[in-house]
């Protein structure tokens, strides 16, 4: 029977496919335009089942136990009706076998009419009315057939659920076919697998698989066929009527429901995303329940149509059935908004008719259920949007559709809410569709949910025709996938061809869908520039925000407290503000794809957005929605407007409405992204509300979620108009608001002078207080102003002395006044110096012109001889001038002695001649004079302190006149005679040069001196030549030229200066050098000394040279000496040359002497050296020593061949890690520092511990390390710890004498002779006497350690017990290291043993002090001495912790006398 049924079903299917192939092609086009909600939701929602059922489902609540019992009773009644219907259908079963084959595939095909002409006529009518009903009917047929196939398995699930009214009927089915329920489960499982694969090949395989399993189902399907035959007969009569009636109520319901859904969507957008995942999990279970309820409701209504009692109920149920069909068609025709409106209208009407037989409590449940279902469906719309971006995944979408249907049809029980395994889902799917007996109460939740799904999908789809075209493809594919598993019984050629054609069409659709451009209605904001963002009204008008109670800086001053106390007026203003802000936000943040959607959505949304909170509250509170659908929507809009003021009356309700509006406006800014979060939160709220009484305001539940969301809102952009009366009675709030208003009246800006300071708290500006840095800078600027040397200023003076007005110009020196105002140290002195310099130079020029006119000839002759040399050094001369700045004071002093100054000038000229051999002698003298004058003028300012310093030196030189004169006589006797030859013309020329040089003079005279010294052009063989650089200073020192009295002296002196002092003239002038160098033979030692300490001795030399010239030259010499300090090397070379010349002059001294010298390998060699050579060696000694000390690095191998070449080594190529090296060096350094710190800490500890001992603050216990082992000092103190306590022996010397006496007495009593210690003591004494022996050196090192470590008090070591007891209080611990050698020698002797052991056998010493603190040596009995003798000897001969042996054996010490190092030193 089952096989025949399968064959007939396949045949019927093939015929249907042949007839409807063109219809399906049309469907495909429509499906391309409409992707179903399931497609996009990922199988979590239904495919577009009936809108009327969704409408009813929206008003239903989860079943309570009472409802379940009631529905079971109803199901029993309906089972009787079904039995009757089955009896009728059995009669017609044979006639309808072909018809039955399609039923497993499409349940509604029987109801609507796939093979019936009447139903086809009805379909045609609905096609004419709705435009695309054939597509829907075919889709519905596939769904119905699937549901019929899945009916047998559904019974198990509904039994567990105890929710369904058809339990009894299923029980019969289970008894008849106990094994048939398991197989359909497998079949459904396979079907789901095929859907997962989403490939037509798998569908064909599944068809073959079903062919084997169909025989088990056919028996069940026969009963169902009979039932459905009856249902068909009944519905054929009423189908056309229903279809005629449908359009108008549908449109009405559509309008009302559309408005409801829009308002709900707007309200639910406010909710957060917290419950989104939870709702997505819950959604399939809800949909299962609703689907099953829907199907059972349909079947029960059809069967009750057979009963005469329920005949009246049959028509509404059939209407609902047809409405479902029509609404399915409308769902795929979402592109047509007008028909959507009709569909919603009919949904509402069908809901009203179906729920006339139900209680008001069920109606309230429906309301809540409806809201939850619509929330889910809104979430579904979001998922649609997400999955629209994945067109290539159509196969998965088909699988998801199947899953969603199966999940929707599984009844929702508390235990099964979480079960989502595919087997259970598919089993529930089969069961839900095998039970047509479920009550109408269960139909309504499904209707509601599906209606919400349709609406939520329709909103984006209405706006996006392309998207809807894409969405239509998915329902078609799902229908095909449903058809294939059912029809694959006996596949004919025509059926196969039709399948292949359908697959080709489907693949083409998928290809087109993949390639199609889909406008995803996600929030894709338009790209905005920063200027556009910043030019928004909410940003540009922060003042209005603050005035209205919002905070421009919400992070600093949140205004929540003000919002809680909003008055009604404020609330209205706030609502208006929020509306404006929402409009602005929606316009600004509108996505690019939204521009087209706006026009359609405006037509379909009859209510304004501001009313959405009211709509939500009304729908939650109003139980009459199913009965008055049309009026409800209108009432909702009206009540929404009224509800805002009502909320405003209550303080807590204020915030509810306020925040609800805030949420609305903000969700409008993000219309799509927020739907899922809003739906999630709404659904959670509805779950809470469902079990609460209606008295509780649902908006308060919203408040919880809204308050959670509020911190995320940008409250700074909310513009709220200021309230007419204070927002809160609290004064602090008013004050704070006033402050904010005041602060916001002005746009923040910084104004004012740069010297002003702005108080950021008050905004006041005040003058900046000058800081210490500013004061310092001001003072510095004043000093800089003072340096503007306004020497003179011309002032016009008008006088009327002689009766007429006369104007006289007077130049006033303002510099003195400035100095008086801002006194600078030495400024007045410097000015006086400058003034005096000018006077002196003028006077000198006059005197020189007079006096030198007579001496001009003689000077010309003398200086012609040195002219060549002068010209050579001319460039060096001028820097020299710049250097010698400071001797003006002396010149002022020297002004008195004109003759002495003449001599000084002459000598200056000589020195200049030495330094500048290329200059004419006349020019040199003039240069000297002019240099002195110019330096007086120019260098007075920069070097006042140096002048004073030089002045002091000059005075000192005057004191030493006698000794200096003697030295100068030796060196420069002819100097005074050189002054005469200088002529006035020469002086004038030098003066001009001086003024030219003046510009080059700076305060950096020392640098110029250094350059002169390093120039290497100064004569280096004589004292004078070494001082020659400073001759410039002498020239500059402005010696009065009137002092050139002795011309003969000047000539001799000039000859002496020029006689070979220059290195360049050594060969030519050697003969003239000879006599002078003989005189200067005594000088070399002094020269060497000068080289060593250039400053001081150079000063003395200068004084010596200056003396014959009278004080003038002495000034110049100090300057010269400063230069000498830089030229040690040159001086040494000069001295060498000097010595050479002296040796030439003194051949008598050249008798060689033999000396022992060392070569580079330190081999001794005998060297013969004359006195001159020794002097040269002595002169060069410093340089050689410097080389040894690596100041001039050299090696012994330098002289060898090729040793200066660089040999490449492998180590040169190594590249070291700098960080690693740095780290290692740091570690080494840290260890060294740590060791040093430890040593220092130990020293400090020792010092502190010693001090604390006396006060008994710290008890220090010095014990013998091992009392039995023998003698070992355990003194923790370091050697340096007691270095400051060296006064102990001196303080307690009388005590030591007493102790020493007692010790000697004790030794005599014991029979120990002090002579025993004599060998050691004598050896120590001998070594101390041998000052050169290395042995002494060692003992000296030891003694130095001992001397550094001293003790405050000397402890009495070797005394009798009685004496030790007496001296315990005064005795202080100590170490042997502290004792002097005499004491140690005695102690060493005492430790050698008793009278029996005089032969230096050593005994041990043990401590027997009363306190461990006391460091006392006690005497031993003879027994103890004998027992410990050997150990003590070992320990005493070993070194202690300090590394010092207390006893040195005498046999080692004689060797120390043989060391040679000490003899050499």
UniProtKB/Swiss-Prot annotation:
Detected in the ovary but not in the testis (at protein level). The modification Phosphoserine is found at residues 45, 49, 52, 64, 75, 109, 114, 350, 354, 381, 404, 406, 432, 434, 444, 456, 458, 468, 963, 990, 1093-1094, 1287. The keyword Cell cycle applies. PANTHER family: CLASPIN. Residues 1-12, 1067-1076 have a biased composition (Low complexity). The keyword Nucleus applies. Keywords: Cell cycle, Coiled coil, Nucleus, Phosphoprotein. This is Claspin. One of its GO terms (molecular function) is anaphase-promoting complex binding. It comes from Drosophila melanogaster (Fruit fly). It is found in: Nucleus. InterPro entries: Claspin. The gene is Claspin. Phosphorylated in response to DNA damage by IR and HU treatment. Phosphorylation does not require mei-41 or tefu. Residues 154-163, 217-228, 336-346, 1109-1123 have a biased composition (Basic residues). Required for checkpoint signaling in response to DNA replication stress; either resulting from normal embryogenesis or induced by the DNA synthesis inhibitor hydroxyurea (HU). It is not required for the G2 arrest resulting from DNA double strand breaks induced by ionizing irradiation (IR). Necessary for the timely phosphorylation of Cdk1 at the mid-blastula transition. May have a minor role in maintaining genomic stability in mitotic cells. Residues 121-133, 205-216, 229-246, 254-263, 273-286, 296-335, 358-373, 400-417, 845-859 have a biased composition (Basic and acidic residues). Residues 260-281, 564-587, 839-874 form a coiled coil. GO terms for biological process: mitotic DNA replication checkpoint signaling; mitotic G2 DNA damage checkpoint signaling. Belongs to the claspin family. Disruption phenotype: Hatch rate of embryos is less than one percent. Nuclear morphology of embryos is normal until the 10th nuclear cycle when the shape and size of nuclei becomes abnormal and surface nuclei also begin to exhibit an irregular distribution. The phosphorylation of Cdk1 at the mid-blastula transition (between 2 to 4 hours after egg deposition) is also severely delayed. Increased sensitivity to HU with reduced survival rates. In the eye disks from mutant third stage larvae treated with HU, there is a higher percentage of mitotic cells compared to untreated mutant larvae. GO terms for cellular component: nucleus.
